[in-house]
Structures are given as structure tokens and as C-alpha cells.
Design a protein with these regions (language model features):
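Small-residue (G/A/S/T)-rich helix-start motifs and N-terminal tracts that mark the onset
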Residues: 1-132, 141-158, 163-281
Length: 281
């Protein structure tokens, strides 16, 4: 059964906020993002998480870009990890594992690049972390030819590929897109958010089709914001399918607000970040 979301249904998905709550009640989120030359991806993902209500955002980045991210960002807790060639190294895995048990959700992928080290990091998180994981961008790409690590995972996993990334991990788009997404999600035991015009979000049993968004969002960094939003909602206790669907709707609607106010040619992901609070009021 295919469902569509609207603003009211999305707001109903979001948890109520207790007057006595503290920052720890709204999710401790770990992001493993960025590499040399792709510092913006990490920053945008972190701010996407914060703008969607995460209480605490921890951002682990390669040591070589740590100073850049620390200057860029005020609210997230940024920390350096061992790197090789400007990308996360397998030597960072011990440090990462030491942090996982205190986290409510983890995002891996925006801007991390493709290397043996980043593949080792993605695999280690999937195998070690007993909680929900979001994989985006190169967090997906490094699993090309190694996707069995997804099938055996006992905890929620959300993948957010565009068409090319979907094909790299074995997705078959020769058939109907909804059918292809549902089949992949069932086979791999994941929630799949297949980006595109009318983004599809499915766990293989229940499916949402998102109607918000516009061509002005076809710009680098837009997907990084979305992945940060998804992991934020996961960390706040929302079920994986609903977290992905709500984030997709809000992300697209923020893009629509920016297109109306600024035009599709000049709007940026940072403009979408500024639009999000109005949609969550």
C-alpha cells in the first residue's frame, strides 16, 4: 500500500516535548562524515540534524579537516579521528566503537570518500552498533560488492541512494521504481529512501511516496542535509520508516519554501536549513 504525507501527518509523527526535558532526551547523534575537500558535507549534515531537533550532535571527522569543521560549527561536538590521505582510516575504528554505546542513532557517509579505510569504518559500524544506522552517499558506495553486511544486520538500517548509487549496490531499475525499491528493501532488510522526483520510502511492506521538492534542490549538499534530518528523527525515537518519510517531506517542503522565496536558480542547502524551523512550529 502506497501512502502520501502532508504537513499535518508529519507533525503528528514528531514526538511531543516534555516541559522538564533536557538535551539528552532529544537524541544523542553520532555523525561520521567529511574528508579533505568535502568539509561542507559534514557541516550540512550536522546542521540538518540540529535543525530537526536533535539534542546532542557529535561529529567525527578525519583529523586533517578537524580544525576546519571546528571553526565552521558552533553547536555540534566536533572531534578528530585517525585519517589516511584525508579520509577516515581503519585506525579510527577503535575510537568510534568506544563512542557507539552512548548514541541513539548513527549516520555514516556524507563526504567520506571511497577507500579501504572508509569501507572498514562503514562495515565496523554496521557490525558493532546495536542501534539504527543511516548510510548516505559514499557510505553506500563503499558497499558495492560487499552488501551482505546489510542483510545480516539485526538493527534498523536506512539507505538513501539516488539512482546511480542504487544500481551500484545491486538495485534493479529496469522495472517499476516502486517495485524495485520494495523488492530491494525486502531482500536486504532495510528501509530504502530512493531519491528522485517523487522520492520513494519503503521497508518492503509499507511505502510512502513524497510529493514535495523541486529542481532547485538539485545542488551539492542537499542530500547531506536530508541524511542529517533522518538520523535526527531516528535519535528522537521515531520509527525508521516514519523518520525517513517525515524527513523527506520536510526536506522537500523546505526546498519548496526556498524556491518560492528565492527562486530555483539561487537557492542553496543553507537556505533550506534556515527554512526548516518554520515548518516545525
Amino acid at each position: 500500500m502506497v501512502k502520501h504525507l502532508d504537513h499535518e501527518s508529519v507533525l503528528n509523527i514528531l514526538p511531543d516535548r516534555d516541559v522538564n526535558a533536557n538535551k539528552g532526551d532529544f537524541g544523542r547523534i553520532l555523525l561520521l562524515c567529511g574528508s579533505r575537500g568535502f568539509t561542507g558535507a559534514a557541516a550540512l549534515a550536522a546542521m540538518g540534524a540540529l535543525r530537526t531537533g536533535a539534542g546532542l550532535v557529535y561529529l567525527g571527522v578525519p583529523e586533517s579537516i578537524y580544525a576546519i569543521e571546528a571553526i565552521k560549527l558552533d553547536e555540534p561536538v566536533v572531534f578528530p579521528l585517525a585519517d589516511e590521505g584525508g579520509m577516515l582510516s581503519d585506525r579510527s575504528i577503535g575510537d568510534i566503537k568506544g563512542r557507539l554505546s552512548t548514541m541513539d542513532a548513527v549516520l555514516v557517509g556524507p563526504g567520506i570518500g571511497r577507500s579501504p579505510g572508509t569501507r572498514a569504518v562503514v562495515t565496523a559500524v554496521l557490525e558493532s552498533y546495536q542501534g539504527p544506522v543511516v548510510l548516505d552517499a559514499d557510505g553506500i558506495n563503499v558497499l558495492s560488492g560487499h552488501r551482505d553486511v546489510l542483510r545480516g544486520r539485526k538493527y534498523p538500517t536506512i539507505l538513501t541512494p539516488h539512482d546511480k548509487e542504487f544500481r551500484r549496490i545491486g538495485g534493479d531499475l529496469s522495472v517499476d521504481r516502486i517495485q524495485a525499491a520494495e523488492s530491494f528493501a525486502r531482500e536486504m532488510g532495510v528501509v530504502l529512501l530512493l531519491k528522485g522526483h517523487e522520492t520513494i520510502i519503503t521497508n518492503g511492506q509499507q511505502t510512502y511516496v513524497n510529493g514535495t521538492g523541486n529542481p532547485g534542490m538539485a545542488v551539492g549538499g542537499c542530500g547531506d542535509v536530508l541524511s542529517g534530518m533522518i538520523v535526527s528523527l531516528l535519535g528522537q525515537g521515531i520509527e525508521p520508516l516514519e523518520a525517513a518519510a517525515a524527513a523527506a517531506w520536510l526536506h522537500g517542503k523546505a526546498g519548496d519554501v526556498c524556491a518560492q522565496e528565492l527562486g530555483q536558480y539561487g537557492m542553496l542547502p543553507t537556505d533550506m536549513l534556515r527554512a526548516l524551523p518554520r515548518l516545525l512550529k
